[in-house]
A protein has these predicted regions:
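Outer membrane beta-barrel strand-and-loop segments of large Gram-negative receptors
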Residues: 1-62, 72-76
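Detector for outer-membrane/organellar transmembrane beta-barrel domains
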Residues: 2, 6-7, 52-60, 66, ...
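Gram-negative outer-membrane beta-barrel proteins
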Residues: 2-4, 14-20, 55, 67-73, ...
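Conserved C-terminal beta-signal and adjacent last beta-strands/turns
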Residues: 79-212
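Transmembrane beta-barrel architecture of outer-membrane proteins
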Residues: 12-16, 39-45, 65-69, 82-86, ...
Length: 212
């Protein structure tokens, strides 16, 4: 029968008097200083979903979605945007002990970093096929491809400052292929200890930790 796990963790974060950048132009030069003037209001929700619609199929989704509002009252500046980071995967067990995993991760919306600017959305995807051999599946062969149909993935950072708008474009190498062979030593324990699964959203998207 289908098995579904869903976790939602809403949060609210705010501060007044945070350290923020102050940009100004003097003699055709851009100067940047800091002051304890920045205000932030953030509404955020972390999500984790694991669904097993069939015995050999597992779908996982892990995401962080938020709305940020940065304000600088003295300069009368505000940057209010929404963004999200996600990791999604589909794992399918195939005949001949093969296991196929297709995954995608990235950013949607615009991530704000101060009252002046934000970054654009981006995404990456990958596929992995593996098979185990020998007694107790000690030997594992894995074929991995990251963005096989796109050589690069792109990201932009936008800075708005009055009449000045700066755009910084970045291209990152995404296409990558890998073949790995691993061997496991030791014996598997007959009993399986109960584990607790939690969401661990740091800078790495899709972080899942399991502890005894």
């Amino acid at each position: 029968s289908p098995r579904l796990t869903l976790q939602l963790a809403p949060m609210y974060r705010f501060y007044n008097g945070g350290i923020g950048d102050i940009h100004f132009v003097k003699d055709n030069k851009i100067y940047i200083t800091i002051d304890n003037i920045e205000r932030l209001r953030r509404y955020e929700v972390e999500t984790y979903l694991q669904w097993q619609p069939f015995d050999k199929t597992t779908i996982v989704f892990n995401g962080n979605f938020r709305h940020d509002s940065y304000k600088n009252p003295s300069l009368q500046l505000e940057n209010s945007v929404w963004s999200g980071f996600y990791y999604a995967s589909l794992t399918q067990k195939l005949p001949w002990k093969l296991r196929l995993t297709i995954s995608s991760y990235g950013q949607i919306g615009h991530e704000a970093y101060n009252v002046y600017g934000h970054s654009s959305s981006w995404f990456s995807y990958s596929a992995a096929l593996q098979r185990s051999f020998l007694k107790e599946d000690r030997l594992t062969l894995r074929l991995y491809a990251n963005m096989p149909f796109n050589k690069y993935y792109h990201n932009e950072s936008v800075t708005n400052q009055g009449d000045y708008t700066g755009v910084s474009k970045h291209d990152y190498l995404g296409r990558r292929f890998q073949i790995s062979l691993s061997y496991r030593f030791g014996k598997l324990k007959a009993s399986v200890k109960k584990t607790e699964t939690t969401i661990e959203n740091s800078d790495v998207v899709g972080g899942i930790s399991k502890g005894q």
